[in-house]
Amino acid sequence: IKQIYNSFVKYRKKGVDVFYVAFSGGKDSVVTLDLVQKALPHNSFKVLFGDTGMEFPDTYETVDYIEKQCQRDNIAFIRAKSKYKPSETWAKFGPPATVNRWCCSVHKTAPQILALREATGIHDFTGMAFIGVRASESVARSGYDYISLGEKHKGQWSCNPILDWNSAELYAYIYSENLYLNKAYTKGNRRAGCLVCPRAAERSDYFARKCYPKEFDQLISAIRSGYEGHFASEANLDQFVTNGGWKARKNGRDLNILSNYEEMEESRKLIIKITNPRTDWKQWIKTIGILQSEASPYCVETKHGIFEFEVEESDGILKISLDSAIVKSAPNFIKLFKNVFHKTALCIRCGVCEADCHNGAIHMENGVLRIDDTCKHCSMCHKVERGCLVFKSLERPKGVSSMNKKNKSLNCYSHHAP
């Protein structure tokens, strides 16, 4: 408790804007919250629950209980949630996978960042999260420090008060202090995260399905929907889902969700074709530079130079062309330029780019994208691979058409779990 208080005092002097307990409803976060509320004044920190919409039903009971407890103790409790339901995002991104785990960014990280911005009124806030991470949980976590600077989001600190605790110490503390314990654990579950997770062990999946069959099967149905039509028979699809083959997905080749983006080279030009783009490219182009002309051929001034390109719009089809010589001479510009049109094609305004922007330049209110003049062209909204999580999730391997449903995998191991 003393270490928590000393860390709070030290980092408050360093300019941390907001301290908060990253609350998940699990046993570790319940203990962490109890330690923090004993160590710090109740008006000096917040409790933040990232609601993915895929939590165990017992977790929601836990969160409701803790929220009432916080209200009684005058501790600010914040629920952060994506504007999209999991059923909506799974249908647009395809089911998450071990490598392609877009769900954490869309349903957890981005909503939390946006909620803290709203709570603090600061776009580029510095936060410190008290997290219930323990070194004994995994090899990776055994290398964590008590306090570390987050890699995922600039300027966000993590403090791990129970890093050196083992499970026995954790449960002993819970029962000795009469803390609320998520009922998921008493039913045999070792974890209380998302019901269906590509990183979950087979044992975890078994208990989750036994305990919460209705909610679990709803998510499994979403996985089936994403792959229907790809398998020769229902039996093969059943085997694929049951064996966890969906967890091994690395791209969009096997999904029945088609991309509206095509890229090719014709007559020494890079050609990009987008059918029914979801967002306005003239908004996204602002993130890489300043558009200097109002009609095609366009010129964009960037930190890599000034470049000319053409855009044709007809019957819902956007055709972009750029001299192939630029592709070879300005690879850094080309990466960002392609990202602009990846976003144009498939952005659903999931909020990740908005959260990544520390200048508050990206706005996505009421389903409309707007990028204002505070944009510094820092490229933080392009840090996601390929510039867009939807594009990355649905992208086909080179040589496989994104518009063709009939492409099948030749990899006999592609339907098995990692």
Predicted regions located by residue number:
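ATP/NTP-dependent adenylation/nucleotidyl-transfer catalytic domains that generate, transfer
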Residues: 17, 187-339, 387-388, 393-418
